[in-house]
Curated annotation (Swiss-Prot):
Protein family (similarity comment): Belongs to the cytochrome P450 family.
UniProt keyword terms in alphabetical order: Membrane, Transmembrane, Transmembrane helix
GO molecular function, one term: iron ion binding
Keyword set includes Protein biosynthesis: no
Primary location recorded for the protein, binned into one broad class: membrane
GO-annotated biological processes: ent-kaurene oxidation to kaurenoic acid; gibberellin biosynthetic process
Gene: CYP701A7
Tissue/organ expression: Expressed in roots and panicles.
Membrane topology designation: Single-pass membrane protein
Cell compartment(s), UniProt: Membrane
Protein's name in the database: Ent-kaurene oxidase-like protein 1
One GO cellular component term noted in the UniProt record for this chain: chloroplast outer membrane
Signal sequence extent: none
Spans through the membrane: 16-36
Length: 299
């Protein structure tokens, strides 16, 4: 500073330049702070023309405190009665548009499909789907169209339907027999339809995919045989439970570097168990193919 003062006019000019840089830094920092505050929800975001109504929330967390359930469809329905079939909510640092009617969802999925062809998955689904390797969760493109065509032809096509007709008839007969037996054993006890459907649908999927109703399989990673119930838990139940696991880092992307060990342990352990069981089932199927025991199946 003494050099600027002693420098006369030159010092005054240098001081002016420094003042300009300081002012620019202050203004830039203020703009950045406003942008971050708006993104975090501390201040209200700028209104966009024709934007859907927004559900009021709290700073930073948005509407997260109102979505305590893992399946918050009832909350969405209540909001639809107030704000209409289209509205926006804030989940942490992100804004989400909620479509809450059949007509609006159909328009979005059909007429506006190109605008939502890229699927934003949670961290749990990213792990469970092997980074969008499953057709239902993959981005719309060549891979999605190719795999969807294969799935449709091999499982839902006319020839596939005819090939597995007897298997479906067997499933229906098994369900009816089970229901009749339950009613006969105790007519006054309510029937739990879900358990019967679960057992028979899983049996159907095993027969169609592997050609037999697998009762057990040896898993190298476990060092033992696992039962059919354990196969179901590893390939179905655990996946459904992990799919709705919430990782708070999904809502605050700027904190994604913070570890969440409990979440990661649950999801990666379930995925590893699923992989081990599927590898064992495929290995067993290859051995059956070599022995000539496989008749009609998808795999």
């Amino acid at each position: 500073m003494e050099a600027f003062v002693s420098g006369g006019a030159g010092g005054v000019g240098a001081a002016a330049v420094v003042g300009v840089f300081v002012a620019a830094a202050v203004v830039g920092g203020f703009v950045a702070a406003v942008a971050l505050a708006e993104r975090a929800g501390v201040i209200a975001p700028r209104k966009r023309p024709n934007a859907p109504p927004a559900v009021p929330g709290l700073p930073i967390i948005g509407n997260l405190h109102q979505l305590k359930e893992k399946k918050p469809h009832q909350t969405f329905t209540k909001w639809a009665e107030i704000y209409g079939p289209i509205y926006t909510i804030r989940i942490g640092a992100s804004s989400v548009v909620v479509l809450n009617s059949t007509e609006v969802a159909k328009e979005a999925m059909v007429a506006k499909f190109s605008s939502i062809s890229t699927r934003k998955l949670s961290k749990a689904l990213t792990v469970l789907t092997r980074d969008k390797s499953m057709v239902a969760t993959s981005d719309y493109g060549d891979f999605h169209k190719m795999v969807k065509r294969y799935v449709m032809s091999s499982t839902l096509g006319t020839s596939a339907q005819k090939k597995f007709r007897d298997t479906r008839d067997m499933m229906i007969n098994n369900m009816l027999s089970t229901f009749h037996k339950l009613v006969k054993d105790d007519p006054h006890v309510p029937l739990i339809f879900r358990d019967v459907f679960k057992d028979e649908l899983f049996r159907l999927s095993m027969i169609q995919s592997l050609g037999e109703d697998v009762s057990s399989v040896y898993v190298d990673e476990f060092g033992r045989d696992i039962s059919k119930e354990e196969i179901y838990n590893a390939t179905v139940t655990d996946m459904m439970m992990c799919a709705i696991e919430v990782d708070w880092r999904d809502f605050f992307s700027y904190l994604s570097w913070v570890p969440n060990k409990s979440f990661e342990t649950r999801v990666f352990t379930a995925e590893a168990r699923r992989t081990a069981v599927m590898r064992a089932l495929i290995k067993q199927q290859k051995e059956r193919i070599v022995r000539g025991e496989v008749t009609k199946c998808i795999l």
